């Protein structure tokens, strides 16, 4: 069973739905429990006992999220034994949970929030730093093509994390904890197709952990 943490505010965002759809393509019988981020606590996760946890993306800037609403999921990220995959904003959430900074890639015009911000979007190339067969990138070439859609990025690696992928827009396109099964990707592996299958392989690898 997968716990899919919905990081959207009031359901405004497609990431949780797209992740669920991708997982169902890969494993049609997979049980997926979707839960809003503000409802997550260590007690909730212990009772549910999922095999894996996925943190969805979001479409609001992180300053729209209160510290109180994030406290439970932050504690889960820091302490849960299950493999955790942070997708796009989920990677940023993982970084924030460990005290690392997150911010805009670049503001290219006046505006507030994501207004006037540069957005990396579309199928883009990402270079892997991870050894072949390692973690969630097993069976992939040195350069993968994956869907990007983000204005924010992780600015500095959290303590005990390694950068496992990069490109010319964001230095930290993926990260992995040194001793726990914590993985973050800035891109959207759930948005794959027959011409761009690398995202699917990443999700398949994660489910095998």
List each language-model region with its residue ranges.
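Glycine-rich nucleophile elbow surrounding the catalytic serine of serine-hydrolase chemistry
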Residues: 88-96
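Conserved beta-strand elements of the Class I
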Residues: 1-3, 101
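Glycine-rich His-Gly loop
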Residues: 6-8, 55-59, 151, 187-189
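Short, charged N-terminal beta->alpha structural module
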Residues: 3-27
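Pocket-forming structural segment of enzyme catalytic cores
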Residues: 98-178, 187-197
């Amino acid at each position: 069973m997968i716990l899919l943490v919905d990081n959207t505010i009031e359901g405004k965002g497609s990431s949780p739905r797209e992740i669920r759809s991708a997982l169902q393509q890969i494993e049609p019988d997979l049980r997926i429990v979707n839960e809003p981020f503000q409802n997550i606590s260590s007690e909730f996760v212990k009772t549910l006992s999922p095999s894996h946890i996925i943190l969805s993306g979001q479409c609001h800037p992180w300053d729209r999220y209160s510290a109180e609403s994030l406290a439970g999921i932050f504690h889960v990220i820091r302490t849960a034994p299950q493999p955790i995959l942070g997708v796009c904003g989920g990677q940023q959430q993982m970084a924030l949970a460990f005290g690392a900074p997150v911010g805009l890639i670049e503001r290219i015009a006046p505006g507030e929030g994501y207004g006037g911000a540069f957005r990396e979007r579309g199928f883009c190339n990402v270079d892997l730093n991870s050894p072949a067969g390692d973690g969630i990138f097993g069976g992939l070439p040195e350069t993968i093509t994956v869907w990007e859609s983000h204005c924010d990025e992780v600015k500095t690696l959290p303590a005990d994390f390694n950068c496992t992928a990069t490109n010319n827009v964001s230095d930290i396109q993926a990260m992995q904890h040194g001793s726990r099964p914590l993985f973050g990707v800035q891109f959207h592996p759930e948005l794959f197709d027959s011409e761009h299958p690398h995202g699917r392989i990443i999700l398949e690898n994660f489910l095998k952990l």
